[in-house]
Structures are given as structure tokens and as C-alpha cells.
Design a protein with these regions (language model features):
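Carbohydrate-binding surfaces of carbohydrate-active enzymes
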Residues: 2-6, 12-45, 49-50, 58, ...
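Acidic/aromatic-lined carbohydrate-recognition and catalytic surfaces
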Residues: 3-147, 151
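Cys/His-rich Zn2+-binding cysteine-cluster or related metal-binding knuckle/ribbon modules and their
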Residues: 155
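Short, conserved beta-strand segments of beta-strand-rich sandwich/propeller modules, principally
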Residues: 583, 666-668
Length: 703
């Protein structure tokens, strides 16, 4: 993706700018690469680097505020006038269209359309947040402003580069559009635009609800209801005015609408994207809150939106400012791997790394939402290994279907987080199903709800999710025919009681295991992801018959697996190292290999190193396998054994198989470490390794 960022000196959208973009596209075309164009000069999208507002100042991001009629400026844009009654504490009591006769407790207020004062991040140092020349954000709730935005950006790109569209150029990326803009002054205001009141009414609002958004309200229920209706109104208008306009343009020009909305839980907007997407930045999700953060739903929502709309791809813009809090350049290869596996476990199949910088030679560049996750970081020489890993797991998640035990109903108003946490921990698969998809895409067939390729026998509805009579009626049609619906905030007890699984993982300490059962090209696959720091061992139990193989996502190599046949099906012994994945595929045309009874178990002897860069150890002739292991590495270790390169360690588990390089008698190990780029661009962090151990395996080691 070509992303104009802070520090770009060439004038945005100038002829020189397009010459540079064309050069990039020609280079990509020669290499058979695909390119996504970015629709803004930084972000959020929608203003064309301020050009929309420069052409018509009325198209700046708008807001509604309440002003006493007697204080309303003569040039103010008054949209509505209400008579408001406040109690002695200044809280809203009543709203009238006309002054009640004989009651002077009502005061006339004008509801005035004004401006948010919001901006976007621009390209020059004086155009960043809070800077005097930050470009003005546009009123993206106004379809005329959005049309002007596409004229300045999309039409210009097509005018200059149309020969690449639908070939090298596959999409336009829109980035977290904001109705208020950044750094907006929203005290006593709400985002608004012309003719939005009709939408507000259609979403269930009344005059009292509108007033409750601008005045303190004693009744908390009224305040919550008003906020809910307002959020629904804004979402609806944003979808119609902004996303639909961009979607129509992209389809008319043979490219996909890509990017992501501003909120992690904005699932209703995702249906407008040809490639539903989200972003994982600013450590919104970490290893500690992977199942509990409100933002943890993002990747699953995008993947499930693609599943239900029939889109083959879904994306995630990831890694931006995901390093150590306060020291973002301290972002290790293992950190990157954890985030990748988090995304793959939830169905993501298009990774958009944030970001690759051509240069970090100045503080403006090196401090622009670090770290660089490409050419200016320590793993660049190994990036092909990382890219191939991404490619293989993206392939696995593309044009495959998962096997959900249940659908979890959701909307942009509420996406259940806590109720699904035990489902993840217990290995039950679910898909988020939006109310919009339930009502407009799903069919009730006998006792099931069917959406595209997915058939749901069980529907889980969080008791905190607002639903109306029409939704209840459609669910009821399924239930009266034998379908299962559970309305509660406790999902796991119901699922364990009512769902019978034929494929699952059985082991100890599996809370950090994510179990994914996929079907692709007629073959069953199992993606087992360890999101924790402790090795997980156990058994994959399945009724799937065929020749099983362990698929190495780093190399593409496969190795056959043997199963034990029991009354539960076929059982495969599996070990998933920390922060790692295990991919098991089954060829239904092959035959199951059964494990032999009484296979000898190798004994283990460990030799601890001194924690320095070199160590020696003695190896007997009866040793059959030798592994090198570290407790921790900061950040990349290059290993030599007996003077020969043994490999490079970037990720957990910090281990290497060095069997082929060892010899009977004395052996030497040399370790050199490359430290974090935080030591160059951020705050100093440790460089080195911990807990070096040589593990010797053999039949007679216990003797």
C-alpha cells in the first residue's frame, strides 16, 4: 500500500506526486505485485488534505449545539428551536415545540449547526495534531462533501493511473473516517449535519432524546437511550453518505473498497467493504487482555463479516505502536509473531503491516508511529521467512470455512466480549452474526439459521444486546421448529450442555489455546494456536478420517502423523510451543496411520550454559538428537556449532535442532545477539540471552 505520511515533501495530488505514484505502480507491475492506493494525506480519511473544506467552508466537519435564543448570533445556522425546561440543578425536565401558555419556566433554545473544529493529521510538521496548519476535517455525514472528496482523490487517481485499475491496483484504502475529526472541540456539541433529524427519528429518536444529548439529564435511562439512538443514527448516515459512496465508486472502477472503520466494534459498517478490515495498533490488544479488551473483537468481526457476505478476503492493518508502552521501538520479532498468530486464529487472511518506511534518517520519520516493521528493523534480512509464514496461513484462512458450534448475535451498539471468553478457553468455535446479516441475509430453514455457507443450529444472544420485535419474530421462527436460542450473559454453560463436538483438543492448561477447525478444498485442517508462554501438550480428537500431516507454516514442509484409534475417534498427540501454531491437515483420500504400541521414548539430559556467548558440551555416540534452548533472547540470536552456522532464532520457542552439526566428544556453541532498534531510536533495553541449555536425547541416557 502506498501511504502518504508525515514528512512527504512533494505536494499531495500534484502532477509530480502522481509521477512518483506511477513509478511505484510500474515497478510493482514488473514484479507482478498488487497495490492498494490510500485515499488521504495521512488520516482520518475524507478531507483530501483539506481540499474539500478549502473549496467550500460549509463542508467542514459539523456539530450541533444549543444556544439560548436571546444569545444566538445573527449569522448562526439555526436548525431547530425548542422550549426547554430545566430543574434547579440544570438538568433536563421537559422539551416542547411551543412555549406552554402561562408557564415561564420554559426557556427558548436554538439548536445551531456549527463546526467541530476537527482536523486530520497532515503531511508537513506544522500539519500534525494541534499544529496551526493541520488540514480541516470534512463533513463526511454530508453526501455532497463526500462527493467532493472523491472528485479530489479517487477521480484524480483514476484520471492519471486508470491503466492500472483492476490489474496492479486492486483497491482503495480508507482509513478510520471520523465524523468530528481529530482535536475537535466537542464541549456542549454533538456531531451533526443538515437533514439528519429525519434519520434520528427513523432510528427511534424523539425531540426529548435530541435534547438529552445536549443537556444533562437526571434520568440515566433516558440518557442511555438517547446515546444509543444517536450512535445508531450516526452509523446509519455514515454508512449511507460516506461508505456507500466510496463503495459505489470502487465497484464502478473495478477495484475493492478496503480499509477499516474508526471503532473496533463497528461491525455494521464492515458490510460496506469489499475486503472487510480492521486495525490493531497502539497495543489495543496484548497478551494480557487478548480475550477481555473491548478491542479484542476486531479481527474476529472482520473475518466473520467476510464469511457471511461471501468476501474471500479480510484484512488487518497491524503492529503500529505495538511495542513496549512508552518505548514503541522495543518491538521484538516474537511480539510480531504473537500478533500475527492472534489474527490468524480469528480468521484474518490479509496482513497489512504498519509500517514500512523508506527512511528513518530524521526524528520526524523515526518517530512517526514507530516502529518500522520492515526494512529499517533488525529482522529485515529474515523478512522472507516472515512473509512466507504470513502467506501460508493467509492461504489457509482463504476460501476455507470454519465449523462454528454457535452464532453470537451482535451489532455496532454491542458486541459481546466477556460472554465469549469461556468459549475461546474451552475450545468452542463461534462466529459473530450481526443483526443486519440476521435480518437481511440470513434464511430460517427448519431449525437452522443459514447465512451464505454457514448453518447455525445454536444462536447466543447477550442479554445486554438491544433487539426489537422484528428480530425476536425471526429468531422465534427458528426456535419453534427446534432451533436453539439462549438469551443470557452466560454462554458457556448452555453450549457445553447442548453442543456435541466431534473434533476438539484435549489437554491440560488449555486456556491459552485457540482451536480452529477448517475445511478447505475438501480437506479438514486444524489450526491450533498457543497464545500463552507455556507449552501446551495434549491430543487432537477427531472423527475426520484420512492421512494426517503436520504442516510447517515457516517452510511449507509436511510430516506424517500417527493416530491412536479409540471410541471417540482418532487421537493425535500434539505439542504446541509458546507463541506458536500447529497446523494439521487431513487428506480424506489417504489412510490413517495408526501409532505403534510400545514405541521407545527418548530420555533427556540437560546441560546448562553459563549465560555467556560461548559454551562447550560433550556428546556421546548414542545421542540421537541434540537441541539448543534459551529461556529468553533480546532480540535475535545467531548460533554457530563447531564453527558452522546453525541458524537464527527470532521467535518463541527459542530453540534450535543442532543434531546434524554435533560430533562425538567435545562440541562448541557460539551465540551472537542483535539487540532492539530501541537502542538506536528509543530508550535503551537489554541485549543478550538468558537460560542457555543443551538438551541431549538418547535411548540409554537414563542408565
Amino acid at each position: 500500500m502506498i501511504h502518504p505520511r508525515l514528512g512527504l515533501e512533494t505536494e499531495y495530488l500534484s502532477d509530480e506526486y502522481f509521477e512518483l505514484v506511477e513509478a511505484c505502480l510500474e515497478a510493482a507491475e514488473r514484479r507482478h505485485m498488487m497495490v492498494v492506493l490510500y485515499d488521504e494525506a495521512m488520516y482520518p480519511s475524507g478531507s483530501a488534505h483539506g481540499r474539500v473544506v478549502a473549496e467550500d467552508k460549509r463542508f467542514a466537519a459539523r456539530a450541533l449545539t444549543a444556544v439560548r435564543t436571546e444569545e444566538t448570533p445573527a449569522d448562526a445556522e439555526v436548525l431547530y428551536r425548542f422550549w426547554i425546561k430545566l430543574n434547579s440543578g440544570g438538568q433536563l425536565e421537559d422539551v416542547r415545540l411551543d412555549q406552554p401558555k402561562g408557564d415561564e419556566s420554559y426557556v427558548s433554545y436554538d439548536f445551531v449547526l456549527t463546526y467541530t473544529g476537527g482536523t486530520i493529521r497532515g503531511l508537513l510538521p506544522d500539519e500534525d495534531d494541534g499544529q496551526p496548519n493541520a488540514p480541516a476535517a470534512a463533513d463526511i455525514l454530508n453526501p455532497y462533501a463526500v462527493q467532493l472528496f472523491t472528485q479530489h482523490t479517487h477521480d484524480r487517481y483514476y484520471e492519471k493511473l486508470s491503466r492500472f485499475f483492476g490489474k496492479t491496483v486492486i483497491g482503495f484504502f480508507t482509513d478510520e473516517p471520523s465524523v468530528s475529526g481529530r482535536c475537535a472541540d466537542m464541549k456542549g456539541k454533538i456531531s451533526w449535519t443538515y437533514d439528519l433529524l429525519e434519520d434520528f427519528f427513523e432510528c427511534g429518536g424523539e425531540f426529548t432524546d435530541l435534547a438529552a444529548l445536549l443537556f444533562p439529564t437526571k434520568d440515566k435511562k433516558t440518557a442511555r437511550n438517547a446515546a444509543r439512538i444517536y450512535k445508531k443514527t450516526i452509523s446509519r448516515r455514515l454508512n449511507d453518505a460516506y461508505y456507500q459512496t466510496l463503495s459505489d465508486w470502487c465497484r464502478a472502477h473495478n477495484v475493492a473498497l478496503m480499509g477499516h472503520p474508526a471503532e473496533s466494534g463497528d461491525c455494521d459498517t464492515l458490510r460496506k467493504f469489499d475486503v472487510p478490515g480492521q486495525d490493531l495498533v497502539w497495543r489495543m490488544v496484548t497478551e494480557e487482555n487478548a480475550l477481555t479488551s473491548p478491542d479484542s473483537v476486531m479481527a474476529k468481526l472482520a473475518a466473520d463479516s467476510a464469511r457471511h457476505t461471501g468476501a474471500s478476503r479480510n484484512s488487518n492493518e497491524c503492529f503500529g505502536v505495538c511495542g513496549e508502552a512508552g518505548n514503541p521501538w522495543n518491538f521484538t520479532p516474537d511480539n510480531m509473531m504473537w500478533y500475527l498468530n492472534f489474527l490468524f486464529a480469528r480468521g484474518c487472511n490479509m496482513i497489512i503491516p504498519h509500517a514500512f518506511y523508506y527512511s528513518v534518517r530524521t526524528p520526524v520519520q523515526s518517530n512517526e508511529r514507530p516502529p518500522d516493521v520492515g526494512p529499517n528493523n533488525i529482522w529485515w534480512k529474515d523478512y522472507r521467512k516472515i512473509a512466507m509464514y504470513i502467506k501460508r496461513l493467509s492461504w489457509l484462512n482463504t476460501t476455507s470455512v470454519n465449523h462454528p458450534d454457535a452464532a453470537v448475535l451482535c451489532s455496532s451498539e454491542h458486541v459481546p466480549v466477556k460472554p465469549v471468553e469461556p468459549l475461546y478457553k474451552k475450545g468452542y468455535t463461534f462466529n459473530y452474526l450481526t443483526i443486519d446479516d440476521l435480518m437481511n441475509r440470513a434464511r430460517v430453514v427448519d431449525d437452522t439459521i443459514r447465512v451464505d455457507q454457514y448453518i447455525y443450529k445454536v444462536l447466543l444472544v447477550d442479554s445486554r444486546l438491544p433487539i426489537d420485535a422484528a428480530i425476536v419474530e425471526k429468531i422465534g421462527r427458528c426456535v419453534i421448529q427446534g432451533g436453539l436460542m439462549h438469551n443470557s450473559s452466560n454462554f458457556i454453560d448452555y453450549v457445553e450442555k447442548n453442543v456435541k463436538r466431534t473434533s476438539y483438543f484435549e489437554g491440560e492448561n488449555t486456556d491459552d489455546l485457540r482451536f480452529v477447525h477448517l475445511s478447505k478444498s475438501g480437506c479438514p485442517f486444524f489450526l491450533l494456536v498457543n497464545e500463552g508462554r507455556t507449552e501446551i501438550t495434549g491430543k487432537l480428537v477427531t472423527d475426520q478420517n484420512g492421512a494426517a500431516a503436520d504442516f510447517d507454516a515457516f517452510t511449507g514442509n509436511t510430516s506424517p502423523m500417527a493416530a491412536e484409534m479409540t471410541g471417540r475417534g482418532f487421537e493425535y498427540k500434539v505439542t504446541i510451543p509458546p507463541h506458536s501454531v500447529k497446523v494439521i491437515g487431513i487428506n480424506p483420500k489417504g489412510f490413517v496411520t495408526l501409532a505403534k504400541d510400545g514405541e521407545p521414548e527418548l530420555h533427556l539430559r540437560e546441560i546448562a550454559g553459563l549465560g555467556e556467548g560461548n559454551m562447550t558440551f560433550t556428546c556421546r555416540e548414542d545421542i540421537t538428537k541434540v537441541r539448543l534452548a534459551f529461556t529468553d533472547i533480546h532480540d535475535i540470536a545467531d548460533v554457530k556449532v563447531n564453527g558452522k552456522d546453525a541458524g537464527r532464532i527470532l521467535f518463541m520457542p527459542y530453540e534450535l535442532d543442532i543434531t546434524e552439526l554435533t560430533q562425538p566428544g567435545e562440541n562448541t556453541v557460539e551465540v551472537s545477539v542483535t539487540g532492539s532498534m530501541a537502542n538506536t531510536y528509543g530508550k535503551p533495553v537489554p541485549v543478550g540471552f538468558e537460560g542457555l541449555t543443551v538438551r541431549l536425547y538418547g535411548d540409554a541416557l537414563s542408565q
